[in-house]
Every structure is written in structure tokens, then in C-alpha cells.
Amino acid sequence: MRDLKTYLSVAPVISTLWFGSLAGLLIEINRFFPDALTFPFFSF
């Protein structure tokens, strides 16, 4: 039961950090390349 409580208290923190960093990354990409359908750094 203690392990379940630990998991339930850690998972929201990890997911909040993950989704927050993902949102920040997407915001920064859209700031440097607005309305881009293809990104220059993915084209080889």
C-alpha cells in the first residue's frame, strides 16, 4: 500500500514536469518558426 501511495504522489509531479517542458518546447519552436509546416532543421 505504501508503494501505491508513493506512485500516486510521484506520477502527477513527473507528468506535470514532462507536459510543461513539452509545452515550452512547442512554444519556443513556434516562436522561431511560426506557422511552419516543414521545419528547416529536419530537412536534409
UniProtKB/Swiss-Prot annotation:
Topology within the bilayer: Single-pass membrane protein
GO biological process: photosynthesis
Organism superkingdom: Eukaryota
Database matches in InterPro entries: PSI_PsaJ (IPR002615), PSI_PsaJ_sf (IPR036062)
A cellular-component GO term for this protein: chloroplast thylakoid membrane
Disulfide bonds: none
Keywords assigned: Chloroplast, Membrane, Photosynthesis, Photosystem I, Plastid, Thylakoid, Transmembrane, Transmembrane helix
Compartment(s): Plastid, Chloroplast thylakoid membrane
Entry's transmembrane regions: 7-27
Family affiliation: Belongs to the PsaJ family.
Function: May help in the organization of the PsaE and PsaF subunits.
Protein name per its UniProtKB record: Photosystem I reaction center subunit IX
Protein source organism: Populus trichocarpa (Western balsam poplar)
Lineage of producing organism: Eukaryota, Viridiplantae, Streptophyta, Embryophyta, Tracheophyta
